[in-house]
Every structure is written in C-alpha cells, then in structure tokens.
Regions:
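Short, solvent-exposed loop/hinge segments that bridge or flank secondary-structure elements
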Residues: 19-53, 82-86
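Short, surface-exposed linear segments at secondary-structure transitions and domain or protein termini
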Residues: 69, 93-100, 114-117
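Edge beta-strand at a domain terminus
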Residues: 58, 102-117
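Contiguous, well-ordered beta-strand patches that form the walls/edges
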Residues: 30, 50-94
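N-terminal helix-cap/turn-to-beta initiation motif at the start of protein domains
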Residues: 14-23, 44, 65, 113-115
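Short, exposed beta-strand-loop hairpins at the edges of beta-sheets
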Residues: 89-109
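Sec-dependent N-terminal signal peptides
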Residues: 3-14
C-alpha cells in the first residue's frame, strides 16, 4: 500500500516531465544554435528553462483545469541574483511553438527544428 501511495505521489511529475522540452526562437530570425544569449534562442530541458543570462528550475507543476497548460513555480538565478516567480506554459496550437505567461507578460515562441541543438 505504501509503494502504491509513493507511485501516485511521483506520477504527476513524471507525466509532465519533458512536455515542453525543446529549443525556441526569441524572434523570427533568432539563431537556434545560440541558447541563452541576445539574438539566440531559449531552451527547456529536463524541467529547466534557459533564458538570456538566466535559468529557472520549473518546480511544482500543476495542470490548469480545462486548459492544456501547466503552472510552475519558477526558481530562477542569473546576473548575480536569485528570485521566484510563477509562470504558465502551454503549447501553441497554431505554430507548434510555446506560449509562456509570467505575471503581466505573455510571450509566444516558435520552436526550432529538432536538429537545431
């Protein structure tokens, strides 16, 4: 019985792991091979979001009711600072890219080709 309870506690994280993994363009002409720099791309890999000069661990995923979206506690560090934010992430149904919503900001990123990184 205890093993079953542990399995159910771990299962939601395993189901969501890798759901948004990929490399995404910051702009239409962004270089997909340059991750984390201005003019380059962003990456989500193994529940870590790599942005420009920063990275965030995507923790405590919660599926948003009646939406194909996930809410994360983002534990971020970069440029000699650390902070926490909440962010909602979902796949872009039109382009196959990513939509990321932070408090007051929404971003839409196109996915780079699979062989970009």
């Amino acid at each position: 019985m205890i093993r079953l309870a542990i399995a159910f506690a771990v299962l939601p994280g395993l189901v969501l792991a890798g759901l948004f993994d990929g490399v995404y363009k910051q702009t239409a002409n962004a270089e997909c091979f340059l991750v984390g720099v201005d003019g380059g791309s962003l990456q989500i890999k193994d529940d870590i979001f790599y942005g420009v000069g920063m990275e965030c661990r995507m923790a405590s995923p919660v599926q948003v009711v009646d939406m194909e979206a996930t809410l994360y506690n983002m534990q971020c560090a970069g440029e000699d600072a650390a902070w926490s934010e909440r962010a909602m992430v979902m796949n872009d149904k039109e382009s196959g890219g990513l939509i990321m919503i932070w408090n007051g900001y929404a971003f839409r990123y196109d996915r780079c080709a699979d062989d970009a990184n």
